[in-house]
Amino acid sequence: MSKVLVLKSSILAGYSQSNQLSDYFVEQWREKHSADEITVRDLAANPIPVLDGELVGALRPSDAPLTPRQQEALALSDELIAELKAHDVIVIAAPMYNFNISTQLKNYFDLVARAGVTFRYTENGPEGLVTGKKAIVITSRGGIHKDGPTDLVTPYLSTFLGFIGITDVKFVFAEGIAYGPEMAAKAQSDAKAAIDSIVSA
């Protein structure tokens, strides 16, 4: 039995293409892998606090006493990291906002990236500590950006996930959604076909 963690990060709730596709992924995965456990975390419905000068102090080893706000941030960081490490497959629904990931997803990463916990520095450079996972990124875009200089989502996510130890990453693209109903329908159809292929593999 595998454990699957789905991270939603769109501010558009049910209108979101990436949310709809991640819901489709869950439906297909449950159909093919009925014994697996699936956890869904909606980072827009339940937002992660923005990392600031106070909160960053909670995530660095120190003997200094923590403020109540820092204690809450550290407890949440511990919870998010434990959840991430406990799952085998990580599904990230990542819409493109202004060429990159959403603030909601970035806030999550800022609390998950902790030296000595999810990565460490060695003589040979940084080493990721979240290993043995597979990641599937479902990314939706209004325009066409794949393989071009305006796609900052793909390289950023590949780099971040690899940095913490997740190197088996597959991407599902839904592009051209803002180009009209016909293009949006094709984007959804192509993305669902890609999801079907991943789920059945």
UniProtKB/Swiss-Prot annotation:
- Keyword vocabulary terms for this entry: Flavoprotein, FMN, NAD, Oxidoreductase
Q: What controls how active this protein is?
A: The azo reduction activity is inhibited by dicoumarol.
How the cofactor is bound: the record states: Binds 1 FMN per subunit.
What's a BP term from Gene Ontology annotated to this protein? response to oxidative stress
Source species, domain of life: Bacteria
Q: Does the keyword Oxidoreductase apply?
A: yes
Specify which residues bind FMN according to the UniProt entry for this protein: S10, S16, Q17, S18, M96, Y97, N98, F99, S140, R141, G142, G143, I144, H145
Reported effect, R60A: 27-fold increase in the Vmax value for p-methyl red reduction
One Pfam family cited in the UniProt record for this chain = Flavodoxin_2
Q: Would the keyword Flavoprotein turn up in this protein's UniProt record? A: yes
Q: What happens when the gene is disrupted?
A: Deletion mutant displays reduced viability when exposed to electrophilic quinones.
The cofactors named for this UniProt entry are: FMN
Q: How is this protein annotated for GO cellular component? A: cytosol
Q: Which reaction does it catalyse?
A: 2 a quinone + NADH + H(+) = 2 a 1,4-benzosemiquinone + NAD(+); N,N-dimethyl-1,4-phenylenediamine + anthranilate + 2 NAD(+) = 2-(4-dimethylaminophenyl)diazenylbenzoate + 2 NADH + 2 H(+)
A molecular function (GO) term: electron transfer activity
Tell me the impact of changing F163A.
10-fold increase in Km for NADH. Does not significantly affect Km for methyl red and p-methyl red
Give the enzyme's EC designation: 1.6.5.-, 1.7.1.17
* Triggers of expression: Expression is induced by electrophiles, including 2-methylhydroquinone, catechol, menadione, and diamide.
- Entry similarity comment: Belongs to the azoreductase type 1 family.
PANTHER family from the entry? FMN-DEPENDENT NADH-AZOREDUCTASE 1 (PTHR43741), FMN-DEPENDENT NADH:QUINONE OXIDOREDUCTASE (PTHR43741:SF2)
Q: Which HAMAP family match?
A: Azoreductase_type1
Could you describe the subunit structure of this protein? Homodimer.
What is the stated purpose of this protein?
Answer: Quinone reductase that provides resistance to thiol-specific stress caused by electrophilic quinones. Can reduce several benzo-, naphtho-, and anthraquinone compounds.
The protein, known as: FMN-dependent NADH:quinone oxidoreductase
Which gene produces this protein? azoR
